[in-house]
Design a protein with these regions (language model features):
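Bacterial N-terminal signal peptides
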Residues: 4-19
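Extracellular/lumen-exposed scaffold segments
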Residues: 21-283
Length: 283
């Protein structure tokens, strides 16, 4: 009797240990996916790098901070095809060991717009490229992988596939955009950048008191994400002070560009969580 239940238990344990070993050896699973079910000549569509991180691991945003390397895709497309840059979702705070950086955990799509030529002929098209990344957790793992996806060419549009449509929609919603409900002024002061965030509409004014936490993700390396932030507030504005990075571009940019993020959201409905800013830097 004991042997009857012990054998499957041992098999289950072996399977579990194998999966743990695989997760340790391969902390990132990456594939090329699309919600498109066909390609129409001359009509742009989206593919995406689908990232699945093992628990405790992360990859990096387009501007990682003072450590890390952003995920990239080098395409090998036929003549007449065009691949745009990655449309980056808003990042989150991650850690390379004890160093704060900007990146992604868990599951994420990195969308890329593809434009086929107008004279595309019927048949099947295979799109190929080589992905590169740095995945870090308790260790760091640089990686490269050849990826491809094949779709039929159709003269008429076909419905998007069910498998990826929801996740594409969620990731597009997570791409930070400008928000006219707020004005941001940036000044340089003794090795720091001071952002003054003021409501510009009545709904933003009503929501100001609800905002408790704000994080800035630098888009160009001007700010050091690993240095402490100072957040203060008055009845009319939020003031965020950050340290200029010793690795900042020289001469310093005349704009402060990046993502402002708050878990309370920037408007009364709790959305958006992230907004894109690009504002002049004044002395």
């Amino acid at each position: 009797m004991t042997a009857m239940w012990l054998a499957p238990l041992i098999a289950l344990l072996a399977s579990f240990l194998t999966s743990v070993a695989l997760a340790a050896d391969n902390p990132l699973r990456i594939e090329l996916v699309t919600e498109a079910t066909s390609i129409q000549p001359g009509k742009p569509f989206y593919v995406a790098l689908h990232l699945q991180h093992s628990v405790g691991y992360h990859t990096y945003w387009k501007m990682p901070g003072i450590v890390g390397v952003p995920t990239d895709m080098k395409w090998k497309l036929p003549q007449g095809w065009k691949a745009d840059a990655i449309e980056w979702p808003a990042p989150e705070r991650v850690f390379m060991f004890q160093i704060k950086a900007q990146g992604f955990r868990d599951e994420k799509l990195l969308p890329i717009k593809i434009t086929p030529p107008k004279n595309l002929q019927p048949g099947a098209m295979k799109l190929e490229g080589r992905a590169s990344w740095m995945c870090c957790g308790r260790d760091c793992n640089p990686g490269f992988k050849d990826l491809s996806i094949e779709l039929p060419v159709s003269s008429e549009a076909t419905p998007p596939g069910i498998r990826w449509s929801k996740m594409f929609a969620e990731n597009f919603a997570d791409i930070a955009r400008e928000c006219g409900d707020w004005t941001i002024h940036a000044t340089r002061k003794s090795g720091t950048i001071v952002l003054r965030i003021k409501p510009a509409t009545e709904r933003a004014k009503l929501h100001l008191r609800e905002i408790e936490d704000v994080t800035f993700f630098t888009g160009d390396g001007l700010i050091d994400p690993n240095k402490p932030e100072s957040l203060s507030r008055t009845g009319v504005e939020i003031v965020l002070t950050q340290t200029i990075s010793e690795f900042a571009p020289k001469p310093l940019p005349r704009q402060v560009a990046g993502i402002l993020q708050t878990p309370q959201g920037w408007l009364p409905d709790g959305k958006p969580k992230s907004i894109r800013i690009s504002t002049p830097l004044r002395d």
